[in-house]
Structures are given as C-alpha cells and as structure tokens.
Amino acid sequence: MDKKQLLRNLPKIDELLKEEIINRYLQENSRTLVVDSLRQSIDHYRGEILKNNIDSFTRENVVNYFIDTLEENKSTKFKKVINATGVVIHTNLGRSLLAKEAIENVVKVSENYSNLEYDLRKGKRGSRYSHVEELIKKVTGAEAAMVVNNNAAAVMLALNTLCEEREAIVSRGQLVEIGGSFRVPDVMKFSRAHLVEVGTTNRTHLYDYENNINENTGVLLKVHTSNFKIMGFTEEVSSEEMVQLGEKYKLPVMEDIGSGTLVDFSKYGFTYEPTVQSSLEKGVDVVTFSGDKMLGGPQAGIIVGKKKYIDKMKKNQLTRALRIDKMTLAALEGTLKCYIDEKEAIENIPTLNMILSSKDIHKKRAQRLKRRLQNNVKDFNFKVSEDLSMVGGGSMPGERIPTYVVKVNSDKITAEKIEEKLRLSKDPIIVRVSKDEVILDVRTLFERDFNIIVEEFKKLLK
C-alpha cells in the first residue's frame, strides 16, 4: 500500500471516540486525557508512515498504542528505578537513599502541620535551622551550624559572607568541576569573591599562599578534590598549616570537603578521606559539605564552624534564597539522629550499609538471584562472577569495592537490547553492559527488587 493511502486510512479521533473500547476508557478517565492519548497514537503512526518505517497497520494497532500511551500519560514522570549498576551514590539515579528514620520523619511532617518556624516553648516565631543545628553540632563537634539547599550554595554563601569583593586564595590544583559543568571558579565568581590561584596543578606550597596575602585577602580556601586524584609528583598544603597561616595573618580558613563523610572509612579498609570532624579538630574556621553523598541524607549544603562566621551567614540576604524546605529538614534530622551511634548509622543508612557490606554477603545474594532467574526464565544464560562496585557521586575516586554480580546473555537477544528493554520496562531496571553481557550488581539491589527483575526478564522475549 502506498504512503498516501496509508495516511488516508488513519482513523479520525471522532470515529475512535465512538468505539466501545474507547468509551470504557472515557468512563474512567477525563475526556482531555483520552483525546490527547488518541492524538498521540495517530501522530505516532503518521510519523512512522512518513518515515517509511511501516507498510501496513490496523485499527487495532492504533487502539493498542493508545492504551499504552494513556497509561504512560497517567503515570508520574518522576518514578522509582531499580539500580543494578553497583554504583552506590548514583548521581543520575538520585544519589543517596534515605534511612527508614528519615523517611518516617518526612511523612510525619509532610502530612501534618509542623513547628517549622515556631518555637513551641516560647509560643513565638522560631528558626527553621534550630531543628538540626544542635544535632549537627553534636555529631561533628562544631561550634555552630546551618543548612542550605546544596553544597554549591553553601560554598557560595560562605564565600559571599567571608570575602565579598575581596580575594579568596586557593590552590590551582583544587579548582574542581563538580559535575554538570559547575565549576568552583564559577561558584566563586557568583559569590563575588575574587579568585586568586596559587601553585601549580600538581604542587602547591605554603609559601604560595603566603606570598599572595595582601590587605584585600578575605579567606584562605581549601577544596577537597573528592571526585578525582592526582598521583605521582604532588604536594599540597595541609589543613593544619593553613590554619597556622590564617592565625598569623588573622584570616579565616575555609574548607570545602565536598562529599562530607562523618565516618572514617580507613577503619574499614578504604583509602582515608577527610572527615568533617577531623577538619574542625584541625582548627578550620568554616567547613562545607553535601548532605546527599557520603552522609547518606537528602540534598543539602551543610555549613559548620566558628559561631561568629556562621552567625554572619545566617544574616546574609542570600540565606533566604538558598534555604531548605521542611521535607529536607525532616529527612536531614532523621539521618543525623542515626549518627549519634556510628554502628547504628552503618546499619540503618543505606549508603553506608551498601558501601561497607561484605563481599561474602553479596555472593550469597547473587547466587539467590541467579537461582530465581534460572528457575523462572528460559533461553538465557546466568552466571555468578566476582566484580567491582563503585562508591559514585564524586566520592572516593579510584576506590573499587569487591562484589558479586549476575552476568546474563542469550543467543536470542543482544545485551544492548536487554539493557534497553529493562530500562524501558514498567519498573525501570538500570544495568551495566560489558562484552555482550548484562551485569546485575547485587550490592545496590534490595531483596524486594529480585521479584521484579525475574518478572521483567520473563517478558523480554515476548
């Protein structure tokens, strides 16, 4: 059939609305939603005809496409996915998962009125920051604390408060890009601090900072390169040395430690990453870090340090523009409460638990998933193998975590096609592909995910 005839055969919306099956959907859904979905179905087939992708279609094809489109239009665009990549803090998949305590706290304050900015003891207006400030101080040892909506905002607010129209001295090797083309120099520019780069990419000495201090210097800045490592012939100035230099010239020292861990991972066999507590113990005046990376909480920028500097930031007009909402506060409070006991934090905060859980545990889980797939899915090959997971989220660069995975292949469908179908399934499953094998890393899977994975694999060849 030629293209013109195919286009003429496309049904009209008015005709389809008279059909019994469409009428059933009209009874359950708004007319606007049904008509829009019908139009999308017809437009789809018109496009396929014009591209010469089809040489025939039936009315039933159009109706079936309408049904799928209607269901998709009814569903929310922001949905849960199953992370089988083994990347624990997956930036594109929402970073850290919240602890049960944090989720319960969010639900409680979201479905009810709350004392967000109300002091129950005094019966007067209160501060939203008071709900978490004492907790942050308790788990970090800081004099004072406040929270904004992300770490870039925390850096911008701190720099704007400490050295607006003044100079911030930073090592050239620490001018990192934090993802999505957001760079530390650009954040500094918007804070209205003047960047002064010192040293070289791989080596910076204390005298590089000292030689650039003048009457217009506002802050000595140290940025932890949490998303990359420079190896070999390197040199950087320690926090202790910077604090001594700051004291000598009466300048505040600020450190952005990015991922912001409260747990010393070197105790568990990982490469040492600076903790918030260690930076404060060394005398750093202001420390900024993220809430949704190594902390395992919601997206937030946490600022801790000397009270005189934090108090100034609270009064900065930028603070209102950067403030967090009640749900973030509730999630952060629930997360921080877990940190009162480190063992409890590791058990209850999914991010910490996934990173620190042993390889042996995941071997048993991988074997369990493989058995369930083999017992329920035909025409696929499944095998358990050793592999490596990643921390992700711009944290612990170069660190790999031994794990076990289930590798999948089939003579009837390519690994790339399996990946695509799983990604586009009702409950999207995000996997890795390597050497024509699909890789399911159980480190980032929950037991509840196994049933869904089995059901989606059963549909792949249909």
From Swiss-Prot:
Source taxon at top rank: Bacteria
Residues bearing the modification N6-(pyridoxal phosphate)lysine: K293
UniProt keyword annotation of Nucleotide-binding present: no
Reaction it catalyzes: L-seryl-tRNA(Sec) + selenophosphate + H(+) = L-selenocysteinyl-tRNA(Sec) + phosphate
A molecular-function term among this protein's GO annotations: L-seryl-tRNA(Sec) selenium transferase activity
Keywords recorded for this protein, A-Z: Cytoplasm, Protein biosynthesis, Pyridoxal phosphate, Selenium, Transferase
EC numbers on record: 2.9.1.1
Cell location: Cytoplasm
Predominant localisation class: cytoplasm
Example GO BP: conversion of seryl-tRNAsec to selenocys-tRNAsec
Cofactor: pyridoxal 5'-phosphate
Pathway in which this enzyme or protein is active: Aminoacyl-tRNA biosynthesis; selenocysteinyl-tRNA(Sec) biosynthesis; selenocysteinyl-tRNA(Sec) from L-seryl-tRNA(Sec) (bacterial route): step 1/1
Residues in the signal sequence: none
Record's GO cellular component terms: cytoplasm
Record's function text: Converts seryl-tRNA(Sec) to selenocysteinyl-tRNA(Sec) required for selenoprotein biosynthesis.
Family: Belongs to the SelA family.
Name the UniProt record assigns to this protein: L-seryl-tRNA(Sec) selenium transferase
Organism of origin: Clostridium botulinum (strain 657 / Type Ba4)
